[in-house]
Structures are given as structure tokens and as C-alpha cells.
């Protein structure tokens, strides 16, 4: 007879989203996380909603019969990343856990533009299992580090980070910010957050430094050589395609 103290008790729950609606799912997860801290509960799901409310430290990503823990020490996420993601990783963004490929973008423009362009190229992203995650100008590298491992056992999900170079053409300040900036001597010398081309002395180094902030393992950063993705495309002969895409979005 085994001592009762040596026995382990597990609760196994398979895909609760198949049986209860969204509000009940949230209530179930909250109850388990609050009352089941001293119990072993294993829950399987294909629901981004559930994945978004479970503490990141408690998530396991299953791929090709391997389990990849998201807990601290297993990923390249640091303590501040976990706090940030617990707050901002919502049900829409949590779709990244179920994708075959992920594209992380920094705004609604790219989030709308890329799927439309893919369709025009007959490469529907949904058909390929690719999810686009819009991080709203902040946190791109935090989301990328979800897929980067400390132990070197890589998750086989390609992740592309699309970020702007954010360096304007010299003519842009007068057009986009203030018409009084028509000459360089009129540009504010302090507290301005924007840069222009003439201020970047080593373009390759500037781009490389941005890339290295997120690159690694299965994560690769893509940066336009010019101002933004949209500006780059228009400047390289894709102006008509851009207009067609914008018209399609409308």
C-alpha cells in the first residue's frame, strides 16, 4: 500500500471551448488559477481566448510531439516581458500560439496591407496557416522572444518581424509635420524624436542595429531601406499595386 502522501492527483480537461461559451471559459480559467494553485491541472485547447488568459508561465506549446514551456528560464523573455505580456497579450494576439508562421507588425497599416498583397500574389496567408500579430507600435521584440529558447531547442515556427526604419526623407518634415520646417535650419534642435536621411551617416550599421534587437533562432527582422514599408513599396515601382490594395481595403 502506498502512502497517501506519495500519490499524485491530476485533473485533465480537454478542449473546454467545445462545450462552453466564451464567458464560461473565462470563468473556468479564473477559478482554476485562483483555487487550483496546489493542484496539478492539465488543460488542452485550441482557443486563443483561453491561451490569452492563462498565465504565460503556465503555458506549454505542443509541436511535433514536443512540449515547449513558456515559463521563465525556458524562453528569452525577461521579467519585464512577462509582466508586459500578461497585460497586453489578448485573444487576438494569442492566435500566434496556434499558427504555422507568424508575422509581427507595428500598426494597422501593415496588418491590413500584407494579407491583401498576399492575396494579390495568390498566396493567401490563412491557407498557409500564417497569423499576423499587430503590436501597435510597441512590444515587437517582446512578442518575438516568446519563440526564442534558452536551451537551444528551437520551436519550428518561422517568425517575421516587420518594423519601419523611421527615418524620413529630408523633405518630409515640412510636408508631414509643420510647413515651417521647409529648411534644415528651421528644424527643432532639441526634444525631437524624428530623424531624416541626411542625419544617418552609416545606413547599413543603422539597419543592422535594429535587426539585431530581435533576430535569433527562428525570428528574423525585415526593415525597409527607406522610411516605412508603404513608402518603400511605392518608391520601388509598386505604386499602382499599393493603390489597388488601398482600393481593395475600402
Predicted regions and their residues:
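Switch/communication elements of ASCE P-loop NTPase nucleotide-binding domains
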Residues: 1-94, 111-112
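Acidic, divalent-metal-binding catalytic cores of TOPRIM
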Residues: 60-250
Amino acid at each position: 500500500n502506498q502512502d497517501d502522501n506519495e500519490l499524485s492527483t491530476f485533473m485533465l480537461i480537454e478542449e473546454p471551448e467545445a462545450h462552453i461559451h466564451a464567458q464560461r471559459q473565462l470563468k473556468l480559467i479564473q477559478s482554476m488559477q485562483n483555487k487550483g494553485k496546489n493542484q496539478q491541472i492539465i488543460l488542452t485547447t485550441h482557443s486563443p481566448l483561453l491561451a490569452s488568459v492563462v498565465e504565460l508561465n503556465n503555458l506549454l506549446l505542443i509541436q511535433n510531439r514536443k512540449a515547449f514551456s513558456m515559463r521563465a528560464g525556458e524562453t528569452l523573455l525577461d521579467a519585464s516581458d512577462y509582466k508586459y505580456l500578461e497585460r497586453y497579450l489578448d485573444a487576438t494576439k494569442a492566435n500566434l500560439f496556434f499558427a504555422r508562421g507568424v508575422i509581427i507588425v507595428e500598426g494597422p497599416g501593415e496588418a491590413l496591407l500584407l494579407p491583401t498583397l498576399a492575396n494579390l500574389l495568390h498566396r493567401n496567408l490563412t491557407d498557409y496557416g500564417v497569423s499576423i500579430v499587430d503590436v501597435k507600435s510597441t512590444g515587437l521584440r517582446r512578442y518575438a522572444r516568446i519563440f526564442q529558447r534558452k536551451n537551444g531547442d528551437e520551436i519550428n515556427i518561422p517568425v517575421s518581424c516587420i518594423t519601419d526604419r523611421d527615418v524620413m526623407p529630408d523633405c518630409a518634415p515640412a510636408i508631414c509635420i509643420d510647413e515651417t520646417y521647409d529648411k534644415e535650419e528651421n528644424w527643432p534642435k532639441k526634444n525631437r524624436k524624428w530623424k531624416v536621411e541626411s542625419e544617418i551617416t552609416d545606413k547599413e550599421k543603422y539597419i543592422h542595429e535594429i535587426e539585431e534587437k530581435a533576430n535569433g533562432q527562428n525570428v528574423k527582422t525585415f526593415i525597409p531601406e527607406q522610411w516605412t514599408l508603404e513608402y518603400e513599396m511605392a518608391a520601388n515601382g509598386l505604386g499602382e499595386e499599393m493603390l489597388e490594395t488601398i482600393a481593395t481595403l475600402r
